[in-house]
UniProtKB/Swiss-Prot annotation:
This is Succinate--CoA ligase [ADP-forming] subunit alpha. Heterotetramer of two alpha and two beta subunits. Pathway: Carbohydrate metabolism; tricarboxylic acid cycle; succinate from succinyl-CoA (ligase route): step 1/1. GO terms for biological process: tricarboxylic acid cycle. GO terms for molecular function: nucleotide binding; succinate-CoA ligase (ADP-forming) activity; succinate-CoA ligase (GDP-forming) activity. Substrate binds at Y160. The keyword Ligase applies. InterPro entries: Cit_synth/succinyl-CoA_lig_AS, Citrt_syn/SCS-alpha_CS, CoA-bd, CoA_lig_alpha, NAD(P)-bd_dom_sf, SUCC_ACL_C, Succinyl-CoA_synth-like. One of its GO terms (cellular component) is succinate-CoA ligase complex (ADP-forming). Keywords: Ligase, Nucleotide-binding, Tricarboxylic acid cycle.
Amino acid sequence: MSILIDKETRVLCQGFTGKQGTFHSEQAIEYGTQMVGGVTPGKGGQSHLGLPIFNSVHEAVEETSADATMIFVPAPFCKDSIIEAVDAGVRLVVCITEGIPVLDMLEVKAYLRQHPDVRMIGPNCPGVITPGECKIGIMPGHIHQRGKVGIVSRSGTLTYEAVNQTTQMGFGQSTCVGIGGDPIPGTSFIDVLEMFEKDSQTQAIVMVGEIGGTAEEEAAEFIQSNVKKPVISYIAGVTAPPGKRMGHAGAIIAGGKGTAADKYAALEAAGVFVVKSPAEIGKGVAEATGWSTH
């Protein structure tokens, strides 16, 4: 088992013929992902990377039975692209794009609430991968290894760090989910923690958080009552000054809330094994689980 995606997942790309859409679709195909086509309005009927192009997601789903989509369209058009995918019956929408207006995401969230059977990952995220089976997003496939650690993260590059270390230690990953660095994500830490807790392949969970917002504190509360599996966590931004945005739109300490210290305190109180440096994530997993390494 894994969560969200597996080798049966049929994937579309919205923004298929653009530079990023092309590059990451190529990478996904190379990885073994079942890419079934792409959407670029006005180019329907043509083919690209040996796959059909459609004018709309509805048309693409009808023709290919796609059940997942990765979105590589410019930020101003993402809201419409996401809603179009939801309306077409796609069950998993992965939006990679950064810079979507917060107001647009509020509208998307409200729309998703009316469609509880649809799961959206992102925006501003690296995507999701089940090693050896399916890769939807921008993560480097070669560092992943099929295994037993579920990884969920607000950061892209720190996800790769956690992946690389758990691969080198021989633990591997069940599924890795980048929920994204924006203030309003489609999927929260809690959503993913709940999935990992129920997943038989996942035996330990790595959660990479960062300053800003209260997502980690809420996750800590959830872990305390609902998660029996060992959770290892790292929070980025310990030295970040208040009021300064640190890369991600959501990574800002505002109104005295959202500091790394607050988050670490909440996680430790919930029994989470915390590490204070990204270099310690792999060791943290070994220590928290008692697993022997390579």
